[in-house]
């Protein structure tokens, strides 16, 4: 993955498609951080076990993380991301959030979501609170999210709305991060580096 692992930005947003290598890169950054004396790392997982496949995926990710980044604490927090960042961020602690896309999904379509419901309207306040926590975090942050706006325009109204909201969130986070990396085929492309 190269030279970008040699220095950790105070804040890094890692975007990419499914299986692009974004989570692996975040884990590599965490492992490099943990090699430093007195360093800690906390992984905030936002996935919820919606179905059997997701339960299996979460278990596989937990196992893989424990193997690749031993010593990193995992916190499962699908909704209260700002509070989790505030609680765990310290100068000696790297916080990895994986992923912003699932977190936004959780806000927009909570567990009690029904097919005829519209997108939840609680998300703007939650996103604003998260952005404040991101900017105020005393320790380094690595944020993982999906870039889903590169494909064809979706047919469904709610799917188009989600793509729009996620695109806006990604832009807001990218503005606040020192480094923004786009992952493709396991390779990092640096979009922004103000570190």
PLM regions and their residue ranges:
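SAM-dependent methyltransferases
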Residues: 1-9, 94, 125-129
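Short, conserved beta-strand edge motifs with alternating hydrophobic and charged residues
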Residues: 44, 74-76, 96-99, 143-144
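Loop/turn-to-beta-strand initiation segments
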Residues: 71, 91-94, 137-142
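Residue-level signal for inorganic ion chemistry
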Residues: 26, 61, 96, 146, ...
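A basic- and aromatic-enriched beta-loop-alpha substructure that forms the phosphate/nucleotide-
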Residues: 78, 87-108
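Short low-complexity stretches enriched in small and charged residues
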Residues: 49-57, 97-99, 103, 135-140
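Conserved P-loop
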Residues: 2, 8, 12-89
């Amino acid at each position: 993955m190269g030279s970008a692992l040699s220095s950790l930005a105070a804040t890094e947003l890692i975007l990419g498609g499914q299986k692009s290598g974004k989570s692996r890169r975040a884990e590599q950054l965490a492992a490099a951080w943990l090699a430093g004396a007195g360093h800690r790392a906390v992984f905030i997982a936002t996935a919820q076990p919606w179905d059997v496949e997701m339960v299996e995926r979460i278990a596989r990710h937990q196992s893989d993380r424990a193997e690749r980044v031993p010593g990193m604490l995992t916190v499962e927090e699908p909704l209260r991301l700002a509070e989790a960042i505030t609680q765990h961020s310290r100068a000696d602690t790297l916080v990895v959030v994986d992923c912003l896309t699932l977190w936004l999904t959780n806000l927009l379509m909570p567990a009690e979501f029904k097919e005829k419901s519209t997108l939840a309207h609680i998300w703007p306040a939650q996103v604003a609170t998260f952005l404040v926590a991101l900017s105020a975090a005393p320790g380094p942050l690595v944020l993982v999210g999906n870039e889903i706006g590169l494909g064809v325009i979706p047919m469904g109204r709610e799917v188009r709305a989600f793509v729009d909201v996620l695109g806006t969130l990604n832009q807001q986070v990218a503005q606040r991060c020192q480094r923004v990396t786009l992952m493709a085929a396991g390779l990092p492309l640096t979009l922004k580096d103000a570190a």
